[in-house]
Amino acid sequence: MAKTLYQKVFDAHVVREVEGETPLIYIDRHLVHEVTSPQAFDGLRAMNRQLRRPDLTWATMDHNVSTTTKDIAASGEMARIQMETLAANCKEFGVRLYDLNHKYQGIVHVMGPELGITLPGTTIVCGDSHTATHGAFGSLAFGIGTSEVEHVMATQTLKQGRAKTMRISVNGKLAAGISAKDVVLAIIGRVGHAGGTGYVVEFAGEAIEGLTMEGRMTVCNMAIELGAKAGMIAPDQTTIDYIRGKEFAPKGETLEQAIAYWQSLKSDEGARFDAEVVLDAADIAPQVTWGTNPGQVIAVNEPIPAPESFSDLMEQQSARKALAYMDLQPGQKLSDVAIDKVFIGSCTNSRIEDLRAAAAIARGRKVAAGVQALVVPGSEQVKAQAEAEGLDKIFIEAGFEWRLPGCSMCLAMNNDRLQPGERCASTSNRNFEGRQGRAGRTHLVSPAMAAAAAVTGRFADIRAL
């Protein structure tokens, strides 16, 4: 029987499947951070259990960390406790930890791929909803809750039902200047922020195949934002070239054997998907969200839609509420809207290619008066590479703040946040009410669009700069 990529990876990991019961699958990689792990470690301790596979477990500090200092207490008492607890737990249970002073420290979903921890055909979990990022490699990667974190720690397995399958194809070539972030925002705008609920989505088509690995990670990172369980992209030569030579990647003959297997990881001809969506790459323009979920998105040169333009009553109500929260009007152009802050970072867009794209816009320009602009590299490795290329100097000379790695302003769990009423052009993945700070107003954009907003003081079409 013809199988999809998802079905192949899922089936390869089934440990036990009995009729009438949820399948038990093996987990190949477990990524851990300071926020969702403390209770899981406590659970192991309470039952006198050991960690089943410390060699398949990696931990880092990212959510709570300060991006201005390596001081563990800089983000407050709760943050300090969580990070100190993670360090103590990792020491007790034998987990490798990349703490604030380690050269591999960074956002967990940036760290995993750049170190070769993330590999095609593997199952990867983390107590974080954007674990879908790793699906860019053809892995089955998804976020789990703290009780499931404990279950994986104790057994290296997880009960998982089979999801429905959706293929989203982006056909044709992207226009110049259109990024992976624009692609995925356009997809979410088309499918809706809940359109993928119950599905594992495979992204396909010429435009997806033409993306770099970092671009593919951006797309899969936001699969959760259309409601999907996970997002996947079939591995190819681009994937193999990216993995080769990474710290934890296979080497020598083992790598060649792995490549032979990875090349089989694609949906078979005739494989049946439960849903299919097709977009034309030529139709995708630079995107900006206007509302309070990622599906409320338009091209930068389009007017904000009227609530009455939506056929669904719930969508109409959501649009009215979003416009009120965002202090926007139907018909208004986002190019006429001034901003207060810019955030370039997060597990969606903090990799070296993202910083290069933003720096290309920032070069020779200045941050607009009254705008605070932060650039937060996704890891120490990214930071070092950017500094070796002189990107930090470009940003600093333009008036951006060059920060230390961390989740930063993506979520209001550290000192980087919006004040009530502040409007932010952000390269992160969520624009929910209060996501970046109480009563803050978030607009999701690509790194280039964020840099353009910083230097113009409002949302600007990068094609016109």
From Swiss-Prot:
The domain of life is Bacteria
The record, for SUPFAM superfamilies, names:
Aconitase iron-sulfur domain (SSF53732)
Q: Where does [4Fe-4S] cluster bind?
A: C347, C407, C410
- Name the enzyme's class: lyase
Q: What is its EC number?
A: 4.2.1.33
Protein's name according to its UniProt entry: 3-isopropylmalate dehydratase large subunit
- Annotated catalysed reactions: (2R,3S)-3-isopropylmalate = (2S)-2-isopropylmalate
This molecule's function is given as: Catalyzes the isomerization between 2-isopropylmalate and 3-isopropylmalate, via the formation of 2-isopropylmaleate.
Protein source organism: Aeromonas hydrophila subsp. hydrophila (strain ATCC 7966 / DSM 30187 / BCRC 13018 / CCUG 14551 / JCM 1027 / KCTC 2358 / NCIMB 9240 / NCTC 8049)
Tell me, how does this one assemble? Heterodimer of LeuC and LeuD.
**Which InterPro entries would you find in this protein's record?**
3-IsopropMal_deHydase_lsu (IPR004430), Acnase/IPM_dHydase_lsu_aba_1/3 (IPR015931), Acoase/IPM_deHydtase_lsu_aba (IPR001030), Aconitase_4Fe-4S_BS (IPR018136), Aconitase_4Fe-4S_dom (IPR036008), IPM_dehydratase_rel_enz (IPR050067), IPMI_cat (IPR033941)
Q: What GO MF terms are annotated?
A: 3-isopropylmalate dehydratase activity; 4 iron, 4 sulfur cluster binding; metal ion binding
For whether the record's keyword set contains Magnesium, the answer is: no
Q: Which GO terms describe its biological process?
A: L-leucine biosynthetic process
